[in-house]
Curated annotation (Swiss-Prot):
UniProt main location, coarse: cytoplasm
Keywords per UniProt: ATP-binding, Cytoplasm, Kinase, Magnesium, Metal-binding, Nucleotide biosynthesis, Nucleotide-binding, Transferase
Gene: prs
Positions of ATP binding: D34, G35, E36, R91, Q92
Amino acids binding D-ribose 5-phosphate: R187, D211, S215, T216, G217, G218, T219
Subcellular location: Cytoplasm
Pfam families in the record: Pribosyl_synth, Pribosyltran_N
Binding site residues for Mg(2+) 2: D162
Source species of the chain: Pyrococcus horikoshii (strain ATCC 700860 / DSM 12428 / JCM 9974 / NBRC 100139 / OT-3)
Name the record gives this protein: Ribose-phosphate pyrophosphokinase
Pathway annotation from the record: Metabolic intermediate biosynthesis; 5-phospho-alpha-D-ribose 1-diphosphate biosynthesis; 5-phospho-alpha-D-ribose 1-diphosphate from D-ribose 5-phosphate (route I): step 1/1
Family statement drawn from the similarity comment of this UniProt entry: Belongs to the ribose-phosphate pyrophosphokinase family. Class III (archaeal) subfamily.
């Protein structure tokens, strides 16, 4: 059976590339004058894959996703798969103060009302996928990240900014056949944290720092400064999601030799496409 996609407003930047490998279902998505969303499905079928990234405006993209799901069910589609390159609220995964919700749990339950399968990219806490009532898969785009940097690293190494991100660095390094490690963080004072790369010599080498999300970029800037002080030749920074605060792209770019993120969120440094990973993981089609 030919695979059919619906592209939400938050994934329009992926539509052209996806259309080279699969059919895009005809839809009409627009806004009423009062700001409410209007969705109409113009074709019928049985199985469909909806692609919707939920970056800012997060709530608008999420509500649109639900309305798309309802419209597809109304049009007779029986099996709905959802690909969410960037899942909003994924960092709100625990209660830190009494009276707070676990916001990502609420989002997962809401999506589960319409969608049978959920595919997300490099979610902040993979355990939160258990909140989704159906099949849920976390995809880490290690292959496309590795291929992008293959010719830039040579005899380099891959570093995680902390122990929690080590698995990401390991996956990329293993594809490239390179050494990997992480930074150890030690709090010296309430305002100062010491960062040290563990058990590696960076002098004269190109280094790639890998993380899931860049927001303010402060950690990456500090890590790059330390690596340069230790004699690193070039420092590259990559993340799956570029959730950049104002001015962060410029600040990080000044501190490193290259900054790149995937296109789960469209930014001016979204240089690495996740569409090949969608095709591999969801469609099992080489692209």
């Amino acid at each position: 059976m030919n695979k059919v996609f619906v592209i939400g407003s938050g994934a329009k930047h992926l539509e052209e590339e996806i259309s080279k490998n699969a059919k895009i279902l005809k839809t009409e998505i627009k806004k009423f004058p009062d700001g409410e969303k209007y969705v109409r499905i113009l074709e019928h079928g049985e199985e469909v894959i909806v692609v919707q990234s939920t970056y800012r405006p997060q709530d608008e993209h999420l509500i649109e996703t639900i309305i798309i799901g309802d419209a597809l069910k109304e049009a007779g589609f029986e099996k709905l798969k959802l690909v969410v390159p960037y899942l909003a609220y994924s960092r709100q995964d625990r209660v830190t103060k009494e009276g707070e919700p676990i916001s990502v749990r609420a989002i997962m339950k809401m999506l589960g009302l319409y969608y049978d399968e959920l595919y997300v990219f490099d979610i902040h806490n993979p355990k939160t996928l258990d909140f989704f009532p159906g099949k849920a898969v976390n995809i880490y785009p290690a292959k496309v990240i590795a291929e992008y940097f293959r010719d830039k690293l040579e005899n380099g190494l891959v570093l995680a900014p902390d122990r929690g991100a080590l698995e990401r660095a390991k996956e990329v390094a293993n594809i490239l056949g390179l050494e990997y490690s992480h930074f150890e963080k030690e709090r010296i004072s309430p305002t100062e944290v010491k960062m040290t790369p563990v058990d590696v010599n960076v002098k004269g080498r190109n280094v790639l720092i890998v993380d899931d999300i860049i927001s303010t970029g402060g950690t990456m800037i500090r890590a790059a400064e330390i690596l340069k002080d230790l004699g690193a030749e070039k420092v590259f920074v990559v993340a799956t999601h570029g959730v950049f605060a104002e001015g962060a792209i410029e600040r990080v770019s000044k501190a490193v030799d290259e900054l790149a993120v995937t296109n789960t969120i469209p930014t001016k440094v979204s240089k690495i496409s996740i569409v090949p990973e969608i095709m591999r993981s969801i469609l099992e089609v080489k692209s």
